[in-house]
């Protein structure tokens, strides 16, 4: 960001480009390996488990994992299962893969760390950095009633009138919490 701004004191387009490329490499690396890993575990072929990615995060859809390993469980049991799988399987796998990337790139040490942020059962992405999730667990905090996580949508922008933000939140909640019936 700042290094690529010609008015920044330490402007250096080469460094800015190097930072951007290394970030892209690390996200693409983990997305590729997560897809391979989850396809192997679940027994699927070329299924894309990575729904979206950002500068420092990936979003996984794990319904096939849930369907295979805890199909007849309650919603609470499924959330507990996903939390445990994230802590005990997915995060260690990501650490291992980022250690491999650091070794391959001859880094002094691996600085890439990813941890689970939320467990959500529904989500809508409209564009990069613009999404809505119906969250059941956020960093270990469990909600009795799911909460909406809204990023980059007009409901979070101060330039959008409050009455419009409130109505948009109502509409989003209605879309995510009700069935077509």
Predicted feature residues:
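Amphipathic alpha-helical interaction surfaces
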Residues: 2, 33-36, 128
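Active-site palm subdomain of RNA-directed nucleic acid polymerases
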Residues: 27-55
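Core structural elements
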Residues: 1-6, 49-64, 122-123
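Metal-dependent catalytic core segments for phosphate chemistry
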Residues: 1-5, 10, 69-71
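C-terminal polymerase-core module
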Residues: 59-181
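Long, hydrophobic, amphipathic alpha-helical segments used as structural scaffolds
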Residues: 7, 34, 38-42, 101-105
């Amino acid at each position: 960001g700042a290094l690529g701004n010609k008015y920044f004191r330490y402007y250096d387009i080469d460094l800015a480009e190097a930072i951007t490329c290394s970030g892209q490499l690390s996200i693409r690396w983990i997305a590729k390996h997560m897809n391979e890993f989850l396809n192997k575990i679940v027994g699927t072929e070329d299924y894309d488990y990575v729904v979206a990615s950002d500068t420092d995060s990936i979003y996984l859809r794990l319904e096939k994992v849930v369907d295979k390993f805890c199909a007849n469980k309650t919603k609470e049991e499924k959330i507990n299962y996903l939390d445990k799988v994230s802590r005990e399987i997915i995060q260690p796998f990501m650490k291992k893969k980022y250690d491999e990337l650091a070794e391959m790139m001859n880094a002094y040490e691996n600085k890439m760390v990813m941890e689970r942020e939320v467990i959500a059962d529904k989500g809508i992405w409209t564009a990069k950095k613009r999404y809505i999730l119906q969250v059941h667990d956020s960093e270990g905090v469990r909600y009795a009633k799911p909460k909406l996580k809204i990023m980059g949508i007009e409901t979070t922008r101060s330039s959008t009138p409050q009455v419009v933000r409130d109505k948009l939140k109502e509409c989003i909640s209605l879309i995510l919490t009700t069935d077509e019936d």
